[in-house]
UniProtKB/Swiss-Prot annotation:
Stated family: Belongs to the PINc/VapC protein family.
EC number of this enzyme: 3.1.-.-
SUPFAM superfamilies from the UniProt entry: PIN domain-like (SSF88723)
Coiled-coil region(s): none
Protein name stated in the entry: VapC ribonuclease PF0355
Function noted in UniProt: Toxic component of a type II toxin-antitoxin (TA) system. An RNase.
UniProt source species: Pyrococcus furiosus (strain ATCC 43587 / DSM 3638 / JCM 8422 / Vc1)
Keyword Transport part of the UniProt annotation: no
């Protein structure tokens, strides 16, 4: 499956992509794709980094240099409210971070890369497209392999 040019990471995917073991994959990803981050994802990532006693001002500068950080705007807020209200009517209580991340991916027309696709399953009918992080990594590795042939 050819990957689209625009992707969005959720917070768990972003944290894992910034691990030492994913350094090469991250470099390739940043070279090949426009990577969007919801401002909520940025907040969650910075929270983890602050917990680890990192300089989060510096961390934010790095994120701003390499990612397209998507601020919460009216369109995203409306889409998120529609999604959450619909899911609540169906008896679900979605996590606000997931709803805002999904709404951001829909707004940017990008593929949401996540470490837990099941969390986003009920939101797919709103136009959300997701891919598990491990599958994305394999697709990127295949893409590189094909370029080397």
């Amino acid at each position: 499956m050819p990957l689209p040019p625009d992707i969005t990471f959720d917070s768990l995917a972003l944290i894992k992509m910034h691990s030492q073991s994913m350094k090469k994959i991250l470099e390739i990803t940043l070279a090949k794709f426009t990577v969007n981050l919801s401002i909520v994802t940025v907040y969650r990532y910075l929270t983890v980094r602050a917990y680890l006693k990192k300089n989060i001002e510096l961390e934010l500068d790095v994120l701003k240099d390499i990612y397209n950080i998507v601020p919460l705007n009216e369109e995203i807020a409306i889409k998120a409210a529609q999604i959450e209200a619909d899911l609540m009517r169906k008896g679900m209580m979605p996590d606000i971070e997931d709803v805002l991340t999904a709404a951001t991916a829909i707004y940017t027309k990008s593929l949401l890369i996540t470490d837990d696709s099941k969390r986003y399953e009920p939101m797919r009918r709103f136009g959300l497209d997701t891919m598990p992080l491990d599958k994305f990594v394999k697709e990127v590795e295949l893409m590189v392999e094909k370029e080397l042939i």
